[in-house]
């Protein structure tokens, strides 16, 4: 037997039932179904994914540094009390590159978020600004994922050569540029 409630039309925006439902949703201070709120939540989610990729790249470099140290930097002995300076420099180079990646990760995690200013929403065109932020976030995630993929392919037995470091720095520069563009977009909202 069919349910008679299935045949009823949904209430329109002029309906009292509709207004009560909207008031209940907004009465808690946040409406999950509005596009701007979804875009704000997506912004945080996307930046956390980009940060995970950067953290994975830095962790891989720290792992490679440990393997390199175990292989080439033996414990001191009477014959060799000091480590080989060339291998020591190469091991420190892993750490320096990982530190540069983590600096970008820190900037990404600490980046400004789009405010929820109810007074100026209509005057600023907030939805368009959130869409522009979404495009910047896509660039951030893609760049971070490419960087993590590049670092994942590094061999474990050798240091970072100049060509690979230049590619890593190129990805870091792209991420820095995307973070700067993101900051410029959000500066409009302040």
How would you describe each model-predicted region?
Residues 1-72, 76:
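Leu/Val/Ala/Ile-rich N-terminal alpha-helices, chiefly Sec-type signal peptides and the beginnings
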Residues 59-160:
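Charged linear interaction tracts used for macromolecular binding and regulation
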Residues 13, 17-20, 43-47, 51-55, ...:
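Amphipathic, non-membrane alpha-helical segments in soluble helical-bundle scaffolds
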């Amino acid at each position: 037997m069919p349910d008679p409630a299935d045949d009823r039309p949904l209430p329109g925006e002029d309906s009292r039932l509709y207004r009560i439902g909207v008031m209940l949703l907004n009465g808690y201070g946040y409406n999950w179904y509005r596009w701007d709120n979804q875009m704000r939540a997506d912004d945080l989610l996307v930046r956390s994914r980009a940060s995970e990729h950067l953290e994975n790249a830095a962790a891989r470099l720290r792992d490679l540094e440990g393997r390199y140290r175990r292989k080439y930097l033996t414990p001191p002995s009477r014959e060799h009390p000091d480590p080989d300076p060339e291998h020591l420099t190469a091991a420190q180079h892993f750490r320096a590159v990982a530190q540069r990646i983590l600096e970008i990760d820190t900037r990404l995690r600490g980046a400004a978020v789009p405010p929820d200013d109810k007074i100026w929403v209509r005057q600023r065109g907030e939805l368009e600004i959130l869409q522009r932020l979404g495009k910047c976030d896509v660039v951030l995630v893609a760049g971070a994922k490419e960087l993590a993929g590049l670092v994942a392919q590094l061999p474990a037995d050798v240091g970072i050569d100049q060509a690979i470091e230049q590619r890593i720095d190129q990805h870091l520069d792209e991420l820095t540029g995307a973070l700067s563009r993101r900051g410029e977009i959000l500066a409009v909202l302040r």
